[in-house]
Amino acid sequence: MCIRDRTHGAKFLRFSFYNYIWRVRVWDETDTPSEWSREAKFRLVPQGFSSAEWIGAITRKDARLPEGRKFHGGELKKPEVKAAWEDVDTLAKKSICLRKTFRTDKKIAEATAYICGLGFYEFTLNGKKVGDSEFAPLWSDYDKSVYYNMYDVTELLQEGENVAGVLLGNGFYNVQGGRYRKLQISFGAPTLLFSLLVNYEDGTRDVVCSDDSWKYDLSPLTFNCIYGGEDYDARREQKGWNRAGFNDARWRPVVVQEAPKGTLRPQMAAPVKIMERYGVRKVTKLTPEQIASACKSTKRTIDLSAFVLDMGQNLAGFPEITVRGKRGQKVTLVVAEALTEEGACNQRQTGRQHYYEYTLKGEGDETWRPRFSYYGYRYIQVEGAVLKGEKNPRKLPVLKDIQSCFVYNSAKKVSAFECSNPIFNAAHRLIEKAVRSNMQSVFTDCPHREKLGWLEQVHLNGPGLLYNYDLTAFAPQIMQNMADAQHRNGAMPSTAPEYVVFEGPGMDAFAESPEWGGALVVFPYMYYETYGDDSLIKKYYQNMRRYVDYLSTRADNHILSFGLGDWYDYGDFRAGFSRNTPVPLVATAHYYMIVEYLIRAARIVGNADDVRYYNSLANDIVVAFNERFQDYDAAQYGTGSQCSNALPLFLDMVLSRGHSGGYETDRHLERKVFKNLIKDVEAHGNRLTTGDVGNRYLIQTLANYGADELIYKMFNHEETPGYGFQLKFGATTLTEQWDPRQGSSWNHFMMGQIDEWFFNSLVGISPDVKHGYQKFRIAPKPVGDLKYVQSSYETLYGKITVDWTRENGRFKLKLSVPVNTVAVVTLPGEKEPREVESGKHEFVVNEQQTINEP
């Protein structure tokens, strides 16, 4: 069978609002065709929203919203800054409901809604929620890109009167503060752009747009902040407000607002949804003495009714409650991933105060959950209510049900991994839950304290992410965010979207760091390796080039000396800025790597001049690197730390002066540097000393040189640093520090680089020169006391399955190769690979284990 990849521009497709239907069939080796596939359809996005206008309750001018991206940290405490934010019109902070009545008096063939509600929206037609997404649209830098969503609403329209209803919240579009906030920024007051296209069976068409004919009123959401939580007063609900027949005479006409500055783009990435739910695992009633003590440690007043629920899983999301009580009674939900010594919810490390408050309307069972805010938590502290069946002398509301809603991007999981080592299996689950918690509109660092898109994770964890999730739609949006964040001079900030500009003493390193900004250049190539799709490289090549040229302006004799270095490296000191490895070494090595990736990109786009120019630059950088950081006699780089030696080994930067006086590759020196790296790991008790940046290079360098047995020893234990200690501690997501007791977030995935090793070494799967897995390598490494590995990986060509076992010195591999692909298989102890085509294969060999020499 032969299936060819083709990218079709489809220039003959010119009309928006029309469906284009397609289906496929294939022919086998005997030229016998298959049945036709089911029909699929797509449509071209409309060129704009026709006559739709941005509408809301108040204009930016009338709202008196401060401008700028420097409102964070100590800046927020300045009197003039506080005064500016306090002067904002309260209407600009509020959630509003908008409604529009319209008629459809003919038979409807199809109806499609296009909507952008900022910061977040909930859209209903005739009282029914449209779609199942949360926090729509995905957030962005609204000065650069604004995303909208499209829905088929044919089945939701009715003959006669219809009502479109939209609930708006602040999101990242309008971070006003009020409780905890990492930052404050406002692109404008909540706003809506809407267009509903109705095609009738008789060939005619109606369009319902957002304009000054819409009406609005304040919603029952009395407070909503992406950082601080959400309050809801059910007494303010207006029954039927989003249905036909409602009397909106008291509602106010909307105002036409200034449009956001960003380009309107269709949201192509999968939406964020409620993907999992967790019930109560354990209930703990707090005593009056515990509450009194906890009030001091948490810096808030805690009601004497308080009890704490352990939901069993740390996650990103919010609670959903069903409660019964009297009108006006309030239930407060405080969420946290940790507890104080007294057993109360502890937000000290994750940003306080964040909570949810629900005011009852007193009409039987009431079910509610937040709409526009989320947090990272495991525990829920309930105040002002009692559990069903408990004594209730104060006649408090009765909590009949409560669940934790795990909210994350709905991109598909494409792999599975299991082995005979319980620590590795559990570590894989820890990483998965942490990634999912931080896989929101962007890849965030944590789901509570910051919620910012720190970029080092995108490429340092990139291979692991691409092994585990379908990023075909998510990655392009990540790249657009990075392109939007890039400065005019080519600089790349450390976060995208860049909601805050880090300035001031000690903050410059956070503003930009090549280990973070390099994702702009590295990640598109990782995407290309995985999917065989070079579109991101071609689309963002100029951005990549501008960043390299910018770094060149920051270099002194080809040495970069700024950034965070090996952030959070490990040792007998407080984690944070790089301590074991010089920042210039890490920055310059990444500078070289970024240039090398740009050279690959230049070859793909066919720019021979750039290939020559940047090859010369790369040579200058690697020479300067060796002159500055190499200690030839000691066979080490920099301080001789693990990161210092792993980086040049991983990047093939180990050179020495030849007889001609110039620098050339020195394999003898390379072997000595590698041996020193091994010695350092062993000297630390087979433990790492690298950090957020160096972890990947250490693990992959050891793997590349055949030291997988050492990697196994490094992580097959229950001590720090290692995943086993976190598991023993009771963590259910990967923590920011190897020792969770040291504080910081308990829901970070930045230390999850081991997942790459699980797949490319233990499973042994990686793309070959034919990118996109049309041709791929299978080279499993049976290390330690592993008895088996079972794994699968869904490529664009189909599912690869790897199942190996070892027993009595015999290694047995079962392999399934997708149609139209080739696997290059290297079995343990064998040097010569073999190629096998699609189908199921079995191999049995005697075990041999070696450490490769470079």
What are these regions (language model features)?
Residues R4-N19, R23-R449, E456-Q457, A473, ...:
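Extracellular/oxidizing-compartment recognition motifs
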Residues A164, Y232-D233, E450, N468, ...:
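C-terminal capping/lid segments that line or modulate ligand- or cofactor-binding pockets
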Residues A111-I115, L125, F318-E337, I380-A385, ...:
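Alpha-helical support elements that line or immediately flank enzyme active sites
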Residues F120, T191-L193, D211-L218, L387-L430, ...:
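Active-site acid/base region of carbohydrate-active enzymes
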Residues E86-K93, T112, V130, L138-Y142, ...:
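Alpha-helix capping and helix-loop boundary segments enriched in small/acidic/polar residues
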Residues K128-P137, D141-D143, E341-Q353, T472-F577, ...:
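Helix-terminus loop motifs that line ligand-binding clefts
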Residues Q184, T191-S195, V208-W241, M268, ...:
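Non-catalytic C-terminal accessory modules of carbohydrate-active enzymes
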